[in-house]
Amino acid sequence: MTERMQSITAIYVPLDGMNAKGLVVADLTAGDDEETYQRTGKVNLTTTTAIRLLLDKAADVDEAVALLKQYDMNSSIGISHHLSIADAHGKSIVVEYVNGEMLVSETKVVTNHYLTDCEKRGVGSAQSRERYDTLAAYSGPAGAPQVRDMLESVAQKNYPKTDG
């Protein structure tokens, strides 16, 4: 795929983004390869199109959750997903789909393992949980230098490639 085509595609199939109201949405793998296929009779939506929908229509976390509840979620690329959603008011959540049910949990940190209170809580790599613990140890407001340090502390180069 050409670079131009990739750039155009990214507009319609984002994996993360922030809108003008300050809503931030990111798609992360959730820790296993169980795909989501909700079948409740609502309109179907894939994880990547959900991100576009939320960035276009939601101003905050509550609006994002209300929008997601209107659709049946379906995995985009054959893996489990969870959505990290935060807004300009400081509210942040993770949305996960387990056994066809949408689960929501407040959290300031999301890595690549399940976080909601369900039978899959904690499923994912040890590295994911270690990165989560490292980031969760930071507290309070963070300026650009602190955010840079936080991201540097959990950079892939700091972890063995054998444990996701």
Task: Name each model-derived stretch.
Residues M1-K42, I79:
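A contiguous strand-loop segment
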Residues V13, D72, V98-E101, R129-T134:
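A general structural signal for short secondary-structure boundary/capping elements
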Residues D27-L28, E34-T36, I93-E96, L103-E106:
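Short helix/loop capping segments that flank catalytic or ligand/cofactor-binding pockets
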Residues T29, L68, D87-H89, E96-N99:
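Short, structured patches in soluble enzyme cores that scaffold and shape functional sites
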Residues G31-M73:
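Compact, glycine/acidic-enriched structural inserts
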Residues V95-E119:
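A cross-kingdom feature marking charged/low-complexity
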